[in-house]
Amino acid sequence: KRIIDECNRQGKPVIIATHMLDSMIVSSLPTKAEISDIANSVLDGASCLMLSAETAAGKYPVESVRTMSKIAKEVEDDIENKELEDTNHLTFTDCIVNAISKIDGLIDIDSIVVITSGGYTARMLASKKLRPKIVAITTKKKILRQMHILWGVVPIIIEGSIDNITNKEKEKAILAALEQGIITKTNQIILTGSVFHFKSKRTNMLEMHKVNEFLDFVKKNE
């Protein structure tokens, strides 16, 4: 639990693996202890649960995956947002992420769209276990692959540069999420990223939009 807490605090993905459904190597049903272990792993803040022998050599690989997925989904709604504990050494990104967490508790947000070149902001958002889906937009395939493991994150790759985020880049990100069916035009979203190009890639933008209103605004001001 301490390792998971520390990883969450630093925005590091946590994979919990090995013998999570060991009985399902030979049985089609899990034990109560295994169900409890999976549920507690999710509640503790794991990013990913991994099966090994259950799917590599077990008699019930599909049932094992289905069982683990079902248990995880059942308990995900009970996860509480994780607040920042150390407020003495906050970065720009920490402050933005904490603000997003508080906004989500005040107003109904459907999705958080984060434009990220290195994935750091997406990792920090994922570590807070927020209710809205996090749509992470990047231009790099390597970062896209890395973000697939993050809790609650749906990564999307787009073409072009995101070093300096203008309204056109924001529009491109939102349209990519729309095309994938992750958000709709009636959704309320939070949009975050880095407006200016810094060597340290500081996250310094936080906007709230209704998708259709933002797209109409950009179109009228082209």
Describe every region a protein language model picked out:
Residues 14-18, 42, 49-51, 134:
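Hydrophobic faces of well-ordered beta-strands that scaffold small-molecule active sites
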Residues 55-77, 203-209:
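C-terminal helical cap(s) of enzyme catalytic domains, especially alpha/beta-barrels
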Residues 180-192, 196, 203-216:
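C-terminal binding/interaction regions
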Residues 154-157, 171, 175-176, 202-222:
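Beta-strand/loop-dominated core regions that host nucleotide or nucleotide-derived cofactor-binding catalytic loops
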Residues 38-61:
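Glycine-rich phosphate-binding active-site loops on the catalytic face of alpha/beta enzymes
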Residues 9, 68-101, 221-222:
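Long, charged amphipathic helices and adjacent flexible linkers at domain junctions
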